[in-house]
């Protein structure tokens, strides 16, 4: 009797572990990076990718007559992107056209699917306040921050001396997710 109970208990534990691993695998296909302290978040957009919230920043540009928002995430497989906009979505364009992204729109939320890395411009009612999305593949060959040939900027805000970064021969500049 004890042997049957032990076997049943082991099977239940194995099934629970498999279920937990499958949940982790599903959630592991999207990586979003926390917003660094001091970055201004956009009040125009909210982005969610497969249920994962993605911070949306206000871009710092020289074009003071326009507002730009940016967001980025890493992913693999096919993901569902939901963008909530305070701007009208009546005349929405997603560029470039080569990706042929045609979202479904329900009031203030646009939903579409991505299955490959891309950089796109989400432009509600023209391009006065676009959201630029950097949709990257999952990283596989992350350089070591201890490598003497790597200039490594980890998550957070960085202000290089004099605003310049000088690379020497055979040096690599690496910006980790969440670095600005």
Residue ranges of model-derived segments:
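Bacterial N-terminal signal peptides
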Residues: 14-23
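Extracellular/periplasmic carbohydrate-active domains that bind, remodel
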Residues: 24-180
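N-terminal secretory signal peptides that target proteins for export/translocation
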Residues: 1-10
